Amino acid sequence: EVWVLRDKRQPIYGVEEGISIRAIKREYARLSGDTRRLTPKEIFEIAEGNLEGNPAAAREAFDHAGEVLGEAIASMNAVVDGIVVIGGGIIAAHKYLMPAVMRELNGTLEMYEGTPADRMEMKAFFLDDPGDCAAFLTPTSRRIVVPGTTETVEYDPMKRMGVITT
């Protein structure tokens, strides 16, 4: 049950408060001052310029949700190594959501002394993107010696995680 992970942007709340339908609606209203009772689909249409409203605020609302989602996925990935499938109605807005998700997954943390460290031990690739998918599938292998022998084997040191939407 990942909903109990913390919301990166508002740590007193669970992650569900930052990535749900109500989160998109609340964040758009806060950013735009728009008091209409809009659905995430309508907020997406505003972001696209197909509906009256504040497109920048609409895109930012999805970006904020993507940041929270990316942090939640990165936290889960620290424990569970696997492919990530993101579904649900909100994923229809993936063009505004996924850039922030990927920024979080491939972002950095800072150590107390100021040294940056990768957020995850692996590189995340957005498999819906042809370029990322090709990079994900391209090995970066080299030959290494098997300890205690003279044998060599092919080894790919790059840890990878694929992220795909449904």
Give names to the regions the model predicted.
Residues E1-V2:
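A conserved active-site-flanking secondary-structure segment within enzyme catalytic domains
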Residues R6-T166:
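ATP-binding/phosphotransfer module of carbohydrate and carboxylate kinases, centering on a glycine-rich
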